[in-house]
Amino acid sequence: MVSKIDGKLFAEMIIQGAQNLSNHADLVDSLNVYPVPDGDTGTNMNLTMTSGREAVENNLSQQIGELGKTFSKGLLMGARGNSGVILSQLFRGFSKSLETYETINAKQFAESFKAGVDTAYKAIMKPVEGTILTVARDAADAAIQKAEETDDCIELMAYILEEAEVSLENTPNLLPVLKEVGVVDSGGKGLAIVYAGFLKALKGETISAQSPKLNKESLVNEEHDFHGVINTEDIVYGYCTEMMVRFGKNKKTFDEQNFREDMSQFGDSLLVINDEEIVKVHVHTEKPGDVFNYGQQYGELIKLKVENMREQHREVVKKEHDGGKAISTEETQAVDTAVIAISMGEGISEIFKSMGATHMISGGQTMNPSTEDIVKIIEQSQCKRAIILPNNKNILMASEQAAEIVEADTIVIPTKSIPQGIAALFNYDETDSLESNKSRMVESLEAVRSGSVTYAVRDTKIDGVEIKKDAFMGLIEDKIVTSHADQFETVKGLMAEMINEDSEIITMIVGMDADKTVTSDIEDWMEATYPDVELEQHDGQQPVYQYLFSVE
């Protein structure tokens, strides 16, 4: 029997929950409704939970309230994708309810689940039932009921998990698309897996790590992945330096403004995150040792990292020369108004830059940037105002979360595709106010229809369309409208659905995996079939999607 949970035990619950999710992330991914080749739910929840776990491991506390704060902050900054953001909000409310406690009993434990659900529902503008939210709510309601009958946290957690799994099995009855495909909700499954890890920890059991099956290389989104390539000799401060300092009682009193001013003398691209007991610093400098020595004035150095950016850049140049994929390492420029576009593909990034985007973040369907990735760019730009273009529905919530965290006055234009992002940026006026720009840019989205061509990763039937693994699919927004083994036939089927008598311009963005012969055939066919519609073509070099289309 476990009657009390303290910080040490809660930390173990987090670790086991994260490990269990990591072991089963590919299973959660396999439950995604649409058979597009993305990382999506399991990947994003895993990376989010891992961020929370790492935060806890770096700042262990016996007090559950203090540990909860750390866990919540780690999840908040590491949240990726909508599923990751919802997970972070669930545990944000969960942890908030614990903040005054050193230990909690079963009743308080149950109440924390309810607080998490309340926070998550408030954070989501349009909650959808049959998702992770429903599973969390049903489990929390069960927790409140069970806490009236038992003081044993093990018995309580077992019941919470049981009811979460019952709720999960019911999700297809609440969300028709799940029933059509024959799966349960992937986010709800991920949450149940975390809860199973919690139960293991409460029982004193541990979960062994399994060999990772995820393609981590396609998911890494470090800060040096964000930007365009520069010359090695142009790098003024060559060492990307990070440290975490735990404040000491007999050390120098921390004043964030003074700390920032002092740190800025060591270099640029300064990022300071102060979490009461710990300060995390990122700076580009020529003297990492001086940065660390300065940090020691305030307390104990608990995490250090130094990367030689000049050496990284030499490797990038060599890879480019050898025909490999370049990693971008451009310094983040300082601006008054940062216009930040999340982009996949070098060609698409160039389009955004040419239209006025000041900063790019590498990301898209297979690589959703975290809240912290977006926050870093805004902070490093030293801007007073920021505009974020997510350009993907699964990056929208992380963008909104980042906008709430940063000091700069920040708006998010709810672009859910690359064509929408381009249309919005076309209507951006750098001389106008944020409010006026937002109104104009959001309005422009209504005139754009977005389409895409990609391949299926499994057999399924959805939206009335039979789909075979490795066949091509044509999508309008998120809806699959056609599928064919032949790429050209898929494009023809997609255009038949997208183009009408009012269509004037078709923009085609060609991906890195597009067949040149097929692209040429598409051009000829479009000219012959739709002579009154102008075709604009761009080399986007995007992965996953052979073609992106917009019709206006």
Swiss-Prot record:
Entry-linked SMART domains: Dak1_2, Dak2
Signal peptide: none
Domain DhaL positions: 8-200
Highest taxon above the source species: Bacteria
Pfam families: Dak2, FakA-like_C, FakA-like_M
Gene Ontology MF, one: glycerone kinase activity
Biological processes, Gene Ontology terms: glycerol metabolic process
InterPro entries hit by this protein: DegV_domain_contain, DhaL_dom, DhaL_dom_sf, FakA-like_C, FakA-like_M, YloV-like
The protein's name: Uncharacterized protein SSP1546
Organism (species): Staphylococcus saprophyticus subsp. saprophyticus (strain ATCC 15305 / DSM 20229 / NCIMB 8711 / NCTC 7292 / S-41)
Lineage, opening ranks: Bacteria, Bacillati, Bacillota, Bacilli, Bacillales
